[in-house]
């Protein structure tokens, strides 16, 4: 089966990537190059212009086995200083984007215009989320998984820096090894911010993937899926004792996540779900208790538990969380 996608399919891949990044997109122009408005919650967000082609080997005995490329056919890429302009390839087999510096290829046209990248770069991004690669021309190519699409779009100019920036930005090639101390050692403010943001996103996405996977993407309080489920920390992130272990996570739908954070709901050390009487009385005093019966009816008696006992919420974390959150019951 061919891995080559049509432009409509590539647009769908981009839109899905924005969604996986935790943002939303309005399609302002569905003709290639695509123009999108990327936004979060009620904020207006920012516009991006996306040039994208399939990233393929291209075949031919003369081509190195590990050389992949995009061919700039159909339209000549052009950098637009008024908008974030992305020059991308999509490799369906590895499920990653590869991005090139638009300023190096603006106006590039020839009988067979192409831009190359190594298969190792694509493979590394698939396995480790991000990969920086210096092409023979000196240009820095960036490969990344879809959940980092918005982070790339926001920081493309910095990410494509070479020279003295290589040491700092090279940390992105091994995000598992990036410690807070290594982040603090980056003296350039812009690069430190970019690497810090991507590292935090990597850690959060890893936690989310593990927790939602453990619960089968079901809310532990009501059982709903519908892609409306978050990975919540049992001990809040703000507390020094919080961890990103799966055992400190619980899958909750948007409604029950908010109720959990507001201390209207809790879970005890026997995994039973509790509604706070004190918080309910506060709501009653404010005249905002309507719907509590239906709210209560939709709750399970005890939380849904992961299939693997190793992923169960740790009872010590539940006890600590109730202390930190000052649960009154």
Put a short name on every predicted segment.
Residues 78-102:
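Elongated alpha-helical scaffolds
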Residues 17, 25-27, 96-172:
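Polybasic, proline/glycine-rich intrinsically disordered low-complexity segments
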Residues 82-83, 123-151, 301-329:
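A short, charged
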Residues 178-218, 237-247:
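Short, charged surface segments at domain edges that flank catalytic/cofactor-binding sites
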């Amino acid at each position: 089966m061919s891995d080559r996608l049509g432009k409509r399919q590539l647009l769908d891949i981009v839109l899905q990537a924005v969604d996986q990044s935790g943002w939303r997109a309005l399609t302002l122009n569905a003709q290639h190059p695509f123009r999108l408005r990327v936004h979060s919650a009620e904020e207006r967000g920012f516009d991006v212009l996306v040039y994208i082609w399939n990233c393929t080997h291209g075949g031919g005995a003369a081509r190195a086995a590990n050389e992949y490329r995009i061919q700039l056919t159909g339209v000549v890429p052009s950098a637009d200083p008024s908008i974030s302009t992305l020059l991308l390839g999509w490799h369906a087999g590895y499920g990653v984007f590869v991005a090139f510096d638009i300023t190096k290829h603006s106006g590039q046209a020839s009988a067979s215009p192409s831009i190359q990248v190594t298969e190792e770069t694509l493979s590394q991004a698939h396995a480790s989320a991000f990969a920086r690669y210096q092409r023979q021309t000196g240009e820095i190519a960036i490969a990344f998984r879809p959940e980092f699409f918005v982070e790339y779009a926001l920081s493309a100019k910095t990410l494509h820096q070479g020279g003295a920036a290589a040491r700092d930005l090279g940390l992105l090639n091994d995000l598992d090894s990036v410690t807070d101390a290594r982040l603090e050692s980056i003296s350039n403010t812009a690069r430190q911010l970019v690497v810090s943001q991507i590292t935090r996103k990597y850690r959060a996405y890893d936690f989310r993937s593990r927790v939602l996977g453990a619960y089968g993407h079901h809310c532990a309080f009501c059982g709903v899926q519908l892609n409306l489920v978050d990975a919540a920390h049992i001990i809040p992130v703000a507390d020094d004792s919080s961890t990103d272990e799966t055992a400190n996570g619980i899958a909750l739908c948007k409604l029950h996540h908010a109720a959990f954070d507001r201390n209207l709901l809790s879970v005890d050390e026997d995994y039973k779900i509790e509604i706070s009487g004190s918080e309910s009385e506060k709501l009653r005093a404010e005249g905002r208790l309507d719907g509590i019966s239906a709210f209560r009816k939709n709750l399970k008696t005890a939380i849904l538990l992961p299939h693997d006992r190793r992923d169960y919420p740790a009872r010590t974390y539940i006890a600590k969380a109730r202390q930190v959150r000052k649960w009154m019951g």
